[in-house]
Amino acid sequence: QDTQSRSVDLNHVIALLRDSGSKDMEKEQLKILKKVVKHFENGLPLKDVAQITEILSLCAEKMNEQEAFIEPLCELIKLFGLPFQKKKSSDEVNYSVEVSQSIAQLGYLMRVPSSQVKIQICKSIVSFYNMELPGKLLSGYQPTSPNYKIQRAEDGRLAEALVLSLALVENQLTEKLWVLKALQHLSTSGVSCGQMVKAQAASRLCLCLNGADPSGQLGFRSSDILWNLLEKASKEEVVNQLRSLECVHALKEVFVDLMCGFRHCDHQLRNDLLVIATLLAENPAVPMIESGFAKVLIVLATCTEVKLPNPLVKGFKLTYSYEDFEMKKLLFNVLGIFSKDPSAAQLLSENHVMPALLYYVKQNQKPGFPDWSAAQYEELQLHAIAVLASVAPVLVDKYLSCQANTLLLVFLEWCIGQDPFFARGNSFHGRGGRGNKLAQMRYSLRALRSVVALYDDAVSTNLCDQGAISQLLDILKYAVEKSKEKEGTILLEIQTDILFILSVLCENDDHRKELFSCEGIDILIPFFTMDPRKLYSGLGHNRLLLSALDCLWSCVIGCYIAEDSFIEKRGIFLLLDLLALKEKNLCNIILGILVEFSDNPKTTLHMSIWRGKRDQTAANLLIQLWRQEELDLGVKRDQYGMIVDTKRPIVTSFQKQQKVIPLPASCPSFAIMEISESIRAKIYSLFCKLGFENLPGLSTKDFVTLAIIRRYIDFKIGEVWNEISAEIKEEFRPVTSDERTLKLMSQLSDNTGKTVVALQTEVLERQHHQEIQEEKNIYKEIQATRTQREMINKSWGNFLTRTSNYEALKKAKMLQKALIKASRAEVKVHNEPDHSTDIPKLHTTV
């Protein structure tokens, strides 16, 4: 074998092919080419690939003059389909550049005007992916790794060259199918897909879809490559290439033809193209409506429900196969996408989309299509109601004319009913709904929410006239009870949606608020006693609590009956308990609610009574929130909480960084906008109701902060005047009188700051004096205690002396008698009894 290997001189072959001469020379060239093919029939060594490629190029040039070179050229190309062979492991790396260039040359050879050559090139490329080892190997050689050729094809940008070659086989079906087959294999690589996209592969393949092909392979191969491009390359770039009217029209024609197809493969291809159409529809720039494709899809999506004849779907028959089921879901999905495009609203309205979707809003006792299984019908039902949530806000008039509110309310009534129903819960939309009706309830409420969120009076009135408030409260009560058994994201979402719907319905309508207060407050109160740890569970408790607070604001505040009922049920206490958690995202809304409630005189009384942990008062809590807010906003304060800058005492760090920007009169300045964004204005409003005097539970630092809060509105006025002054001076020079006024306002603001600083200083000095006085009192107590202890010690020492020294005892006795005698009156009283100072029979020395 080695001897044979050395007997083929490739340099000699190349030199021979470069000669052009007589007929005999041509025969000699063909003979030597056959010898080369025979020699390498078991595979090409990597070291010879570059020379074989040069021989290929020379043969291609010869072929233009002599057709006899076609066969040897094809035989040489066939060698590239065999495994390359290496002598050393390092050969794969050492010859990688030469091999990449050689494989790239295969792509360039697609320009050779020979069908046989083009087909053989494609066959060899396909062989890269189905590598079979030859019967024999060259002695001392091993085949390269299985992916070696594929990697070198990526390096040589073979896929890009093949895409460009599609233009050369435009009218040659067999060659085109082989090129597509090769591209199909190449498109399994993300790198090759990227190269194909650069060569505009998506648009070229889309135009291939509707080509004449009795076998049907053209459409399947093209769609498969398009799928790979969408998955492995830039989806945005692929969609951008398919957005031309010509491409969309071609896609539509193929889809319409496949609609009437009866083969299983036709249905599969139809669904594949429908997915591609869905991806295109997501891009507003794609002319789906202009091409008429959108109308075809909408009519097809609704034809089985509305049962109205339409020429666009003539010949289409639903077979209830799995492919038709998948198509139905894809069409529902397309309807949801079209609902986001305002220009498609008319098409959706004219083609009965609303009645088609509402067809599924009914209980599942009798499935709409007898040929769908129960699980399939349930999946379609849930999908349709989910799409209804997207379509309904776009077609409000149709929604109302079809009595959708009535259908949804009746359906929701069935959802909380006791009649037996076993849901499968297999689909995406059916999650958490196995064995119950929670999935149906969830999507029905989502549809209601989407329409109510429009704040359309006609929708709200229509709902309330049908008793929606009472019914929604019943459903909310049902969901709350179910949550006690087993809490989950679906039940939390249901409760959140109901609270939102009630908020919109009751807002600005006292009569509806009264209806809500009958049962709603009792249901609402428990939400405010939620375990704070649940807010971080990630299940949606935080959204539920915010919805409950929003519902309280919209459904209770403003109606005295509802307010009194809420306050009597300890509602203000619960709100303050929540506020004491100091959750950043809750504080603003809770303070806003308390400000609204503060118009009710009972509110301030309850706020004054409330006590939190460690006997904290409402005033202390509000002051703590104020200090934390100023810390977050970067307001400058000293270690005692006193004002540092008397000219700008409450300005935030953000405001200080802002340059002077002249604004129109209708546009609020930073000082005004800060009021709505910060909680300080709300805290100030609450203190205006609570009062600034005789507030229990406050420390000296609290009183220092309270002095700032008390003058908040004055400081704000000063801020606004400073902004006015800065804006005027930026553009103009004020006249003398205006200059005087601006200066006066600035001085007033500065004086206010100094006054507050003086008050704060007085508070601190008073506290300091009190601390000194307390310290003196404590010192006196310590001194008295020490004196007492010394006296006790002295007494104890005397006692020890008397008990251990008899002479001392006698002396003490004598002293005692002398003291007794001295204490007696000198004048004797007649018949006075004589009292002995000795205790009889006493044997102690005390």
Regions found by a protein language model. Give the residues of each.
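Elongated alpha-helical scaffolds that mediate protein-protein interactions in large eukaryotic proteins
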Residues: 1-253, 258-272, 278-329, 337-359, ...
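Well-ordered alpha-helical segments within folded domains of soluble proteins
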Residues: 272-275, 329-333, 382-386, 443-449, ...
